[in-house]
Design a protein with these regions (language model features):
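Metal-dependent phosphoesterase core characteristic of DEDDh/y 3'-5' exonuclease domains
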Residues: 4-6, 19-24, 30-59, 79-182
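Metal-dependent phosphoesterase signature
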Residues: 55-77
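Short acidic, Gly/Ser-rich segments with clustered Asp/Glu that frequently serve as metal-coordination loops
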Residues: 12-20
Length: 182
């Protein structure tokens, strides 16, 4: 049986959590295997900065000032990459508000939809989701917590847990597929 094509995944790193936070990096993993990542230069009134979040993603204010792109450029690039598609996130509640803020500040309409990865998972997949993401991250030797790397991990974990829908339960659904001896 042919497997379903990979799903488009989006991930957002932010200045912190909650009120006053804003997007600082957006990463996508596309269905064709490409990834894209955009650092975002904060707007002048985006001053919230949570040291705990910064320690997690490792992005400094200095890096954003030096390498960050204007919100309009990032929003236009996302529209170009994702127009007409649905991009899935494993943190829909937060990521959707940060993407909405990005497009609001850019003054551009968002030309793609965001939806929750959880809507794609059945109960068996949900039960192994966190472990599968950890396993995929380890297998890919990704230690950094950055948007494009996280999007790729989510995409691969979704594909891996999708095997639960497509194959009989032989061995661990998280391990590499290998035929068992009768």
């Amino acid at each position: 049986m042919l497997s379903a094509p990979p799903t488009v995944i989006i991930d957002v790193e932010a200045s912190g959590f909650g009120r006053g936070s804003y997007p600082i990096e957006v990463g996508v993993a596309l269905a064709d295997g490409r990834t894209a990542c955009f650092l975002i230069r904060p707007q002048s009134d985006w001053t919230h900065w949570d040291p705990t979040a910064a320690a997690l993603h490792g992005i400094s204010r200095d890096l954003l000032a030096a390498k960050g792109r204007d919100v309009r450029e990032v929003a236009a690039s996302l529209n170009e990459l994702l127009a007409g598609s649905t991009a899935y996130t494993d943190a829909w509640g937060m990521d959707s508000s940060w993407v909405a803020l990005l497009f609001e500040r850019a003054g551009l309409p968002q030309r793609f939809r965001l939806d929750a990865v959880a809507r794609l998972l059945n109960d068996e997949q949900k039960a192994v989701w966190a472990d599968c993401k950890s396993l995929v991250r380890a297998e890919m030797c990704l230690s950094r917590h950055r948007a494009s790397a996280d999007a790729l991990v989510i995409q691969q974990a979704l594909e891996r847990t999708g095997e639960l829908r497509r194959t009989a339960r032989r061995g661990s659904p998280l391990s590499a597929a290998s035929p068992e001896s009768p």
